[in-house]
Amino acid sequence: MTIEQVVDGLPVSESQYYKVSKGASAFRRQEHLVLVLERLGVTDEDDVGFLVDIHRDGLSRGWWSTYSRTMPSGMAFYVGLEDGAKAMRCWTPTYVLGLLQTEEYMRAQFAAAKPVDETTTESIERGVEVRMQRKRILTRDNPLELRVILSEASLRNVVGSPAVMRKQYEEIIRLAELNNLTIQILPAKHETYRCAYDFNLMEFGESLPTVVQMDTVDGGSNVTDKDTEIWRFSRRYDVLRDGALPVGRTPKFLNDLVREI
């Protein structure tokens, strides 16, 4: 269904729907979301209620609303989706995935970008607070089912200092012991496919569509549930997974890095 077909006859503009579908904005009125969902064929009461809750949280009610003014474009909406997801599949080629990061790693990563992003020390601390809050979905009741593929480069790129990296390796080893986490590593020496940018596939249950999130150049977030994009990124994830080390070899790989750095 095209954008024109979705909004035809609805009190929603094409540009507004486009921004919402990309995760860069949100409908200001709940009834507009419900109308769009009906047009898209989402009518199950539980499904609609779930999406309305996420939408409302993205606007004001979620814990992240306290930080929304300091978040990049679309990030508050993404955090709302992440908080409501049942499962995620992630690939990171450059940095350790945010949900796996230690507080020290987060702070060092934000600080390194300070001259480029022209951020303040206060905004860095708020960014760290947000990421630490987001990590709670890994250990909450009914925790997120997280499957991650980390490139070796993301683990060898030194963020902060060797001491920060050692603690980060140990944190990943600890998290890998959780039943709801599956962490694989793609070694540099493996002759296989690599995606140049990170992405996250988010699943909400059988009756709701999977969405894929990609970071934008300005630090924002782009989200889509287009079938063609979900197929493309699912295929990429599957190929990356097949090229990575088996899950059981993750602790040894990381322990070797602890000794080497």
Q: Residue ranges of each PLM-predicted region?
A:
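Short acidic (Asp/Glu) and glycine-rich catalytic loops that position anionic groups and cofactors
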Residues: 16, 30-34, 211-216
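C-terminal regulatory/effector modules of DNA-binding transcriptional regulators
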Residues: 142, 149, 156-261
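Base-recognition residues in the alpha-helical recognition helix of bacterial helix-turn-helix
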Residues: 19
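Interdomain hinge/linker segments and adjacent boundary elements that couple functional modules
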Residues: 3-9, 22, 26-156, 225, ...
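Short Asp/Glu-rich motifs
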Residues: 15, 56, 195
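Key DNA-contact positions within bacterial/archaeal DNA-binding proteins
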Residues: 4, 14-15
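Short glycine/serine/threonine/alanine-rich loop segments
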Residues: 1, 12, 181
